[in-house]
Amino acid sequence: RIDRLMEDMQPLIDGTIEGAERTRDIVAGLKRFSAQDRGEEEAFNLAEVLERSVHWVVKASGSRIRVSLDVPPQIPVSGSAGQMQQVLVNLVQNAIDSTERQPDARLDIQGEVRSRSAVLTFRDNGPGFPEESLDKAFDPFFTTKPVGKGTGLGLSISYGIVERHRGQLKASNHPQGGAVLTLTLPLAG
């Protein structure tokens, strides 16, 4: 009888550890969500913040994802460069996570400056968003990642930051596959 209990023990311990790790991730996300700096608005070059974010995330993750950056050298926007870096890091990390099973993982980032706004488009070659959950992509605690891989707060927090910068963040699927996230921000000045 004790042997049977011992056999059941490891899966129970594993489940408890997995649950604790998820709780830790949720708490960390909530801390980030509640402690976002609301500092002074300042003009900054979104292209520089993007390049730094891509470099940092790809290097830290050890991913072999191929990132294509096609953005103008100057994208003048205003707000908090630190908060916007948090958004960009999250978008790049999500692309890495969703393409980890792809032998030729790719993330294409295109940017353009329009008359009054800057637009960045992030397209990966992962599975994309399940159609039935596309409208929930920015809901707090919604995630399509396996347990222990995400809290479901990253896109929600990013959406809130972008809104506070008077911008928009939209999710869609590319007709040829993969997720597309489009970030639009007003130009500085």
Tell me what each language-model feature is.
Residues G154-S158:
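Short alpha-helical Gxxx[C/S/T] motif in the catalytic ATP-binding
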Residues D124:
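Acidic ATP/Mg2+-coordinating residue in the GHKL
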Residues V162-E163:
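Detector for a conserved hydrophobic position within an alpha-helical segment of the HATPase_c
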Residues I2, M6, Q10-I13, E40-V54:
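A conserved beta-strand-to-alpha-helix junction within the catalytic ATP-binding
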Residues G62-P76:
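Conserved catalytic submotifs in the C-terminal HATPase_c
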